[in-house]
Curated annotation (Swiss-Prot):
Domain of life: Viruses
Ligase found in the keyword field: yes
Protein name: Replication-associated protein G2P
Annotated InterPro entries: G2P, G2P_C, G2P_N
NCBIfam families registered for this protein in UniProt: rep_II_X
GO molecular function, one term: DNA binding
GO BP, sorted A to Z: DNA replication; rolling circle single-stranded viral DNA replication
Family label: Belongs to the inovirus G2P protein family.
General function of this protein: Isoform G2P plays an essential role in viral DNA replication. Binds the origin of replication and cleaves the dsDNA replicative form I (RFI) and becomes covalently bound to it via phosphotyrosine bond, generating the dsDNA replicative form II (RFII). In turn, viral DNA replication initiates at the 3'-OH of the cleavage site. After one round of rolling circle synthesis, protein G2P is linked to the newly synthesized ssDNA and joins the ends of the displaced strand to generate a circular single-stranded molecule ready to be packed into a virion.
Pfam families: G2P_X_C, Phage_CRI
Length: 410
C-alpha cells in the first residue's frame, strides 16, 4: 500500500522572482505577498518595535501546519525557495489514514491517493491552492509498505530482533534509529530508507495516545480515528504483522523509471498496472531487493512461549495510579524463564542470589508451571529459514472484508 505520499506544488510563474546568489540564480516568492493573497499566517525570526509605533519584521517563514480531514491530518508547508528548493507548497500525509482512518492495510492506487491529498487541500485552503501550478505538481517521496505474517506477536518480535544484525551491500542497519519493535536501514540516505516494525505494537500505541486525551480536547477526526482503530477485527488482523516499509525518495524513483511529475506518474502507473503488474509493489520489491538477498540461506532459532507469557501476565500485573495495566513484573519473570530455557536450571541457580532465585521460581510456579518442568527446560532445536517469516504474500495484504476506500472531503 501507499503509506505516505509527499507532493510539491510549485507557485504559478507570475509569483516567482529570481535573484543571483554567487553564480546561482535562485527562484523565490515574496512570502508576505503570498500571505496577503492566501490569508496564511507566517512566523518571523525578528520583530523590531520602534518608538514611533512602527514594527519591522524580518526572517519570514511558514511552519508546518496540519489540515484536518475526515479521519486524519494533512501536513503542509510553504517554501520560499532556495538554491536546492523551488518555491512551492509541500503537502504530505498517509493516504491510507486520510481515506480510511488507519494504515494497517490500504490501496496502491496512486491516482486515488493523490486525489485524497489534493482535493482535501484545495477544499481547506482554496485561496492558497489558486496560487499554485497544480499541473506541475511533483512527487517528492512515496512510502510503499507491505507485510509478512508471523504466527503470533511473540515470534514477530523475535524476527525483528534477528533483523537488527542483517545488512547487505549499501543497505546498512541504522542502530541509532532502532527501537524495541523497529529496525531501520539507511536512515540518512537520499535514495531510500528501509524500515521493519511490528504493526500491532504501533497500533496499540496509537490507540493509547488517542484514548488518553480528554474527549472535550479531541478533534472530530481524532474521535473518528479512535473509533476505526478500536475495531476488534482490525486489531486481530494486525497481530503478528511484520511491516516492511520503503521510504523512496526522488532519486530512487527516477532510477526505477517513474516520472516525477504527478500526472505523468499516474499515467505511467495506469499503463504499468494494465500489464497485470502493480507499480507500488514492484517499487517496494526494487527497494528491498538488496536487503532480501541477505535473507537467503539465513536462519534463526525460533521459540514460541506465548502460552507461558500469557500465564505469567494473567497472574503478575499491577494497575497504575492512572488506571493502566503494567506488566513490568511479568516481563522480569518471563525473562527469568527464558534464562532457564537457554542456560539450564542449575546454571541459573549458581549465578543468582539464592533468595532471588527461589522468589522467581515461586512466582512461576504460582502461574501453573510445575517446578519439575522448570528443572528440565531446554532450548528446542527449532532452527528455521529466515525467509519463512519474511514471506510477503501480495495476495493476502488485506482481509477478506476490505473494500477500496471512497474519498471523503472534510
Amino acid at each position: 500500500m501507499i503509506d505516505m505520499l509527499v507532493l510539491r506544488l510549485p507557485f504559478i510563474d507570475s509569483l516567482v522572482c529570481s535573484r543571483l546568489s554567487g553564480n546561482d540564480l535562485i527562484a523565490f516568492v515574496d512570502l508576505s505577498k503570498i500571505a496577503t493573497l492566501s490569508g496564511m499566517n507566517l512566523s518571523a525570526r525578528t520583530v523590531e518595535y520602534h518608538i514611533d509605533g512602527d514594527l519591522t519584521v524580518s526572517g519570514l517563514s511558514h511552519p508546518f501546519e496540519s489540515l484536518p480531514t475526515h479521519y486524519s491530518g494533512i501536513a503542509f508547508k510553504i517554501y520560499e525557495g532556495s538554491k536546492n528548493f523551488y518555491p512551492c507548497v509541500e503537502i504530505k500525509a498517509s493516504p491510507a489514514k486520510v481515506l480510511q482512518g488507519h494504515n494497517v492495510f490500504g490501496t496502491t492506487d496512486l491516482a486515488l491517493c493523490s486525489e485524497a491529498l489534493l482535493l482535501n487541500f484545495a477544499n481547506s485552503l482554496p485561496c492558497l491552492y489558486d496560487l499554485l501550478d497544480v499541473n506541475a505538481t511533483t512527487i517528492s517521496r512515496i512510502d510503499a509498505t507491505f507485510s509478512a505474517r508471523a504466527p503470533n506477536e511473540n515470534i514477530a518480535k523475535q524476527v525483528i530482533d534477528h533483523l537488527r544484525n542483517v545488512s547487505n551491500g549499501q543497505t546498512k542497519s541504522t542502530r541509532s534509529q532502532n527501537w524495541e519493535s523497529t529496525v531501520t536501514w539507511n536512515e540518512t540516505s537520499r535514495h531510500r530508507t528501509l524500515v521493519a516494525y511490528l504493526k500491532h505494537v504501533e497500533l496499540q500505541h496509537q490507540i493509547q495516545q488517542l484514548s488518553s486525551k480528554p474527549s472535550a480536547k479531541m478533534t472530530s477526526y481524532q474521535k473518528e480515528q479512535l473509533k476505526v482503530l478500536s475495531n476488534p477485527d482490525l486489531l486481530e488482523f494486525a497481530s503478528g504483522l511484520v511491516r516492511f516499509e520503503a521510504r523512496i525518495e526522488t532519486r530512487y524513483l527516477k532510477s526505477f523509471g517513474l516520472p516525477l511529475n504527478l500526472f505523468d506518474a499516474i499515467r505511467f502507473a495506469s499503463d504499468y498496472n494494465s500489464q497485470g503488474k502493480d507499480l507500488i509493489f514492484d517499487l517496494w520489491s526494487f527497494s528491498f531487493s538488496e536487503l532480501f538477498k541477505a535473507f537467503e540461506g539465513d536462519s534463526m532459532n525460533i521459540y514460541d512461549d506465548s502460552a507461558v507469557l500469557d500465564a505469567i501476565q494473567s497472574k503478575h500485573f499491577t494497575i497504575t495510579p492512572s488506571g493502566k495495566t503494567s506488566f513490568a513484573k511479568a516481563s522480569r519473570y518471563f525473562g527469568f524463564y527464558r534464562r532457564l530455557v537457554n542456560e539450564g536450571y542449575d546454571s541459573v541457580a549458581l549465578t543468582m542470589p539464592r533468595n532471588s532465585f527461589w522468589r522467581y521460581v515461586s512466582a512461576l510456579v504460582e502461574c501453573g508451571i510445575p517446578k519439575s518442568q522448570l528443572m528440565n527446560l531446554s532450548t528446542c532445536n527449532n532452527v528455521v529459514p529466515l525467509v519463512r517469516f519474511i514471506n510477503v504474500d501480495f495476495s493476502s495484504q488485506r482481509p477478506d472484508w476490505y473494500n477500496e476506500p471512497v474519498l471523503k472531503i472534510a
